[in-house]
Amino acid sequence: MLPILLSVALLALSSARSPFFDLEDANSNSAEKFLRPPPGGGPPRPPPPEESQGEGHQKRPRPPGDGPEQGPAPPGARPPPGPPPPGPPPPGPAPPGARPPPGPPPPGPPPPGPAPPGARPPPGPPPPGPPPPGPAPPGARPPPGPPPPGPPPPGPAPPGARPPPGPPPPGPPPPGPAPPGARPPPGPPPPGPPPPGPAPPGARPPPGPPPPGPPPPGPAPPGARPPPGPPPPGPPPPGPAPPGARPPPGPPPLGPPPPGPAPPGARPPPGPPPPGPPPPGPAPPGARPPPGPPPPGPPPPGPAPPGARPPPGPPPPGPPPPGPAPPGARPPPGPPPPGPPPPGPAPPGARPPPGPPPPGPPPPGPAPPGARPPPGPPPPGPPPPGPAPPGARPPPGPPPPGPPPPGPAPPGARPPPPPPPPADEPQQGPAPSGDKPKKKPPPPAGPPPPGPPSPGPAPPGARPPPGPPPPGPPPPGPAPPGARPPPGPPPPGPPPPGPAPPGARPPPGPPPPGPPPPGPAPPGARPPPGPPPPGPPPPGPAPPGARPPPGPPPPGPPPPGPAPPGARPPPGPPPPGPPPPGPAPPGARPPPGPPPPGPPPPGPAPPGARPPPGPPPPGPPPPGPAPPGARPPPGPPPPGPPPPGPAPPGARPPPGPPPPPPGPSPPRPPPGPPPQ
């Protein structure tokens, strides 16, 4: 390897020399002075200046002179041997190198290696080696040793060569950095390596990273002093790139978001960072998948930050996105669309926020259910049914809607796109872009059956007892796939979103609560507990708390239903709970038919309430907008919150409870009064 590297370095140096007459020729002159004397050719030459000019060699017919400018005209003839001079350079550096220390000389070879390898980048590691050489150069520059360093300068030449041997640039960059790096210490070399490292990862994801590495190189010479800055950039890209690729691990996205965002995100501010990450992640990773994961990742980030702030509930949303991501991916990011509604609600939702949320959730639940059979209405209908009695009481009805959103949230959200199809689909499809379209086209079709399969994911609920779920199922199950299957229903779904069913009961006002839970969960908490109250009903009920109070339990069941885990815990509740989940899978499939009727009624019911439901309809539109918003998908997280309830874990013990605790618990009491 070393021989090869040396030869490559020599070639690069020879090619690069012409461009760098000042550095290399000066060094070469010194080298000639030192080396030529033995040959005797050097001393006779009175015009070293010309040589320094570099033209002297060319003008001179002397083959020796023409050989490597290194004094070793004879050896110079052996251009390769010229490298030996580099080898000597190490020795030469030895003196100067000794200053840095001989260690550098060994690196010296690396430099050559790096130059070529640098290009390779894998040798990128050599770049670190070069850094030492780089130091050699610096050191060499300081002292005549330069002749040997001269070769290192060639390293810089590589920059010149960079044009050609871009790789050298990397090497040089390290060298350049090395100088500064050397000053600080090898530490800089690490930066150099980072580029290389990035190069590998960067190359993997895209060579883009290597470019960064090179950029540092370019900077290295001039930038070397500042280079550190460049290195960071270089690393960030690499980091993002690699992480981005990993992004899959939404977490990395988070991490990346900080990094990537750090630069970009930081620019905007944290809030922006989430978006920032999405772009970054999406850009590299996003492009790759553009994995809904990134969106989820970003959502988590965005939600996480905001959501986390509001309460952990948001984190659940984050997970929901992930969960949805899988399921969502299946159905499609459709969830984001609904998410968008929440998203809008989440960020914007918080602003309105409940108003939008209701629509948002309705869209999710309704969209999904409505879309599916339009069982969506059923979801509301079913939840309302159960809630209806209790729902009327508290208007848990809204909470049920909330649950529906949950189920829908993950899958429902995805489904919603179908409903949107008429209005939102364009947006969602566009917003989701290819991803959604991919899934959507199939979903709209008979997929409903498949949709139920998605509900299958709801399996948890299904596990509880699909039987009851059937009614409920339509909502949840339908939500996921259902929505996809028959967009036509979705329109009704929107009316349902009108959760109107429940909304009508209380009137939409309650629906807002329902949605608030979702939206509120993340933003809802932020915006105001008011929404949470409703939210709490679902959450509270979702948790066991609802169970405790029988009265609430009825609503609770709906929430429990939402709370997949809750449903699991107690079959009784599960039935309702199942309705959303369980039904989702099996229930949705079979019951959907009935649900459709149910939904229609719900829709109609909402119609009466529709006046208010009217907002829900907007809600669906928001979903459409959400598509764009969907990208923010954070919205999904909002649904996520409902999902959180659904989120087996989240809902099961903590998340579900946490939401209630945050604002829900207090809101919970209020909700009772509000309904009344």
Curated annotation (Swiss-Prot):
Residues 36-50, 71-424, 442-676 have a biased composition (Pro residues). The parotid hormone stimulates dentinal fluid transport in teeth. Residues 409-457 form a propeptide. GO terms for molecular function: hormone activity. It is found in: Secreted. The modification Phosphoserine is found at residues 28, 30. Keywords: Hormone, Phosphoprotein, Repeat, Secreted, Signal. This is Basic proline-rich protein. Acinar cells and secretory granules of the parotid gland. Residues 29-676 are annotated as: Disordered. Coiled coil: none annotated. GO terms for cellular component: extracellular region. Residues 1-16 form the signal peptide. It comes from Sus scrofa (Pig).
